[in-house]
């Protein structure tokens, strides 16, 4: 089934992929991504592990109603979270060689 040394090479490749995956996970956890709403009037910066680092609110919004501001903050956070997911997919594809995963399955398993 496997040629001479084939299984050893396969195991070596799997270990290398696992090492790259671990480094990539650390890189993703430490990256920062900024999401925006209200044409940039509200910005939320989060890490790759979805911890909020910073919330920036344009002063012009301080006079508007509280409910609208809350909606803009939520929208900015959701935008940042979406950007983290997109970045994770792109970076993981570079490690997995574009290997497609079943729907709903995320790496790491």
From Swiss-Prot:
The keyword Cytoplasm applies. The lineage of its organism: Bacteria, Pseudomonadati, Pseudomonadota, Gammaproteobacteria, Vibrionales. Pfam families: YbaB_DNA_bd. The keyword Cytoplasm applies. It comes from Vibrio campbellii (strain ATCC BAA-1116). It is found in: Cytoplasm, Nucleoid. GO terms for molecular function: DNA binding. HAMAP family: DNA_YbaB_EbfC. SUPFAM superfamilies: YbaB-like (SSF82607). One of its GO terms (cellular component) is bacterial nucleoid. Belongs to the YbaB/EbfC family. PANTHER family: NUCLEOID-ASSOCIATED PROTEIN YBAB (PTHR33449:SF1). Keywords: Cytoplasm, DNA-binding. This is Nucleoid-associated protein VIBHAR_03086. Residues 1-21, 88-109 are annotated as: Disordered. Binds to DNA and alters its conformation. May be involved in regulation of gene expression, nucleoid organization and DNA protection. Homodimer.
């Amino acid at each position: 089934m496997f040629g001479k040394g084939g299984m050893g090479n396969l195991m070596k490749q799997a270990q290398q992929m696992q090492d790259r995956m671990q480094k990539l996970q650390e890189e993703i956890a430490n990256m920062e991504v900024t999401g925006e709403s209200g044409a940039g009037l509200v910005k939320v910066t989060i890490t790759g592990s979805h911890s909020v680092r910073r919330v920036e609110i344009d002063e012009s919004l301080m006079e508007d109603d509280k409910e609208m501001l809350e909606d803009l903050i939520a929208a900015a956070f959701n935008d940042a979270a979406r950007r983290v997911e997109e970045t994770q997919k792109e970076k993981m594809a570079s490690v997995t060689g574009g290997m497609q995963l079943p729907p709903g399955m995320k790496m790491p398993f």
